[in-house]
Every structure is written in C-alpha cells, then in structure tokens.
Regions:
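Periplasmic plug
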Residues: 147
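Portal/gating segments that form or line small-molecule/metal binding sites
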Residues: 1-144, 154-193
Length: 193
C-alpha cells in the first residue's frame, strides 16, 4: 500500500498561500506571493530532491495542477522539470476532464476520495501532495494522510490561506525527523500519532 505524504511550505503563522511567486495565488487580495523564495538554499534543495526521488506520483488539486501546468513545462533549465514531467500527476477535480495537456496528467473521475483510496491501495512508491490546501483538508478528514513534510519558514505573514484552518478536526502528530536550513527554515517530518 502506498502512503500519501503532504509537502508544504508554511509561514510561522501557518500560511501556505503562494509561496513561490507573486502571481501564484492572489485570491482574497493576497499580495505577499513569493515569500518562500528568499529562504531557498542547498539544504532545502537536497531535501526536496530526496523527497521527489522517493515519490511515485503526485496528487494535486485542480488549482495547484493548473498553476503547475502553466509554469513547470516552461522551466527548461530547472532540474526539477524533467522529474515533474515524468511523474504521474493525478488531479482531484470535479470540473477537469481528460486528456489533460501537461504530460502524464490524469483527472480522477467520479468520487475523488474513492479514487484516492484506489490509488493508495496500489503497489508502488509514495504519493506526494504539493500545495492543494482544500484537497489536503479533505484527505485529512477522511484519514488518508500518512505524513507531512512541513517547510516552516521564519516569517509571519499575518494573513492568507492556511494549511490548517479553524474548525479542522483536531489531531496529534509525531515528529519523525527535522533539519534546519542555513536560512532558518525548519524542515519537519511528521506522521499521525
């Protein structure tokens, strides 16, 4: 059985919205996009590379998939582009229909939670969820998240969409490992307690 691992860049106040670019996600007037970029270093790059090497597929929400599909195929000089292109990318959406334009992208049809359970039951390497906040919360509600890799950045954004929101089901996590980058980002790995 495969595990579902959620990997997220978050601020100290739990914001996960638009870590990579100013135009990545401007919903609700969010104007602080790209906040994680100044904290990137070799330690983070190595950790992310190791995580991607252990990944057998990506599971993305519609909005994150659309953002990635519009960005990554054009990043021809980025070493992560061929890795992302090669991975199967499953998209949880009730509005997207196949075939999807980004190579190896597949919409999950029918009930997304049932489809994710089927993916999880297959043999193979772990499934990584990147971004996709609403999907992460839904997976968590259904007991489908097996672990988190949280890149906790040393800044407070004061607003924006959060990984965990008020009203989310309480739950305990167990820290399995952590490393601190040269820029003060704590990369913490957790699994449900």
């Amino acid at each position: 059985m495969r595990k579902i691992i959620v990997t997220e860049s978050i601020s100290l106040d739990g914001v996960m919205q638009a870590p990579g670019r100013p135009d990545e996600d401007i919903r609700d007037g969010f104007s602080r996009g790209g906040w994680a970029v100044p904290y990137t270093d070799q330690v983070m790059g190595s950790a992310m590379g190791e995580g991607m090497a252990a990944t057998g597929a990506l599971l993305l929400g519609r909005r994150t998939w659309a953002d990635f599909a519009g960005y990554w195929p054009r990043q021809t000089d980025n070493p992560f582009t061929p890795v992302l292109d090669a991975l199967p990318k499953y998209v949880a959406s009730t509005t997207l229909e196949g075939p999807l334009p980004w190579v190896n992208s597949y919409p999950l049809t029918g009930d997304p939670i049932a489809a994710v359970r089927e993916l999880k039951a297959q043999e193979g390497a772990d499934i990584s969820v990147l971004g996709s906040g609403a999907l992460v919360r839904s997976l968590r509600r259904h007991g489908l998240v097996d672990g988190y890799v949280l890149l906790v950045h040393p800044l407070v954004l004061g607003g924006g969409r959060r990984l965990f929101e008020p009203g989310d089901e309480p739950g305990e996590l167990r820290l399995t490992s952590s490393v601190t980058t040269t820029t003060g980002v704590v990369i913490a790995r957790y699994e449900p307690a």
